[in-house]
Regions:
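Conserved N-terminal phosphate-binding loop of PLP-dependent enzymes in the Aspartate aminotransferase
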Residues: 1-142
Length: 142
C-alpha cells in the first residue's frame, strides 16, 4: 500500500514500531511542551483558582436556578459546570439565547448546558456572563 518510497525514510513506521503505537508516545517536543504547561499551571496556581472560582460560579448558577424555574440540577467541579433544562428544545433556546448575548456554552447530553471556561477565569468574567444569562432569562419570560 505504501509503495517503495516508504523505504526512503530510514525510521519509517514499518521499521520502527513505536512510531505507530501512540499519538504522543516518545514525541520529545510534546514532552517539553507538557512540562512547560505543568509548570505554568503550578506557578499561576490555576488548580487553586479553578476550585475557588468554580465554587463561586456554581453559587451563581444556583442563584440563577432559583430565579429561572426551567433550570435545574446546577452542578460541577472546579470550573467544569453544568445545569439541566427540561428538554432538548428548551436547551437549544437557552444555548442560542446565551450565544447571541456573547456567552459561550456547550451543549451536553440531551438537555444540559455545560460551562468549561479557562482555568484562569476571573470572578469579573463570571459576573459578566451571569449578568447576560440573567438578562436572557428575564427577556425570555416577557
Amino acid at each position: 500500500m505504501a509503495g517503495p518510497r516508504i523505504d526512503e525514510v530510514k525510521d519509517n513506521a514499518f521499521r520502527l514500531p513505536s512510531r505507530l503505537n501512540s499519538t504522543w508516545g516518545g514525541n520529545f517536543t510534546d514532552m517539553v511542551r507538557s512540562t512547560h504547561y505543568l509548570r505554568i499551571i503550578e506557578q499561576e496556581r490555576l488548580v487553586e483558582n479553578a476550585a475557588k472560582i468554580g465554587a463561586y460560579f456554581l453559587d451563581q448558577l444556583r442563584d440563577l436556578q432559583t430565579e429561572e424555574p426551567l433550570i435545574s440540577a446546577a452542578r460541577g467541579r472546579g470550573v467544569f459546570l453544568a445545569f439541566d433544562l427540561p428538554d432538548a428544545k428548551t436547551r437549544e433556546e437557552f444555548w442560542h439565547g446565551f450565544f447571541n448575548l456573547g456567552v459561550l456554552t456547550l451543549r451536553s447530553g440531551e438537555n444540559s448546558i455545560r460551562f468549561r471556561p479557562a482555568l484562569d477565569i476571573t470572578a469579573g468574567a463570571i459576573d459578566e456572563a451571569m449578568e447576560l444569562m440573567h438578562k436572557f432569562c428575564q427577556q425570555r419570560r416577557k
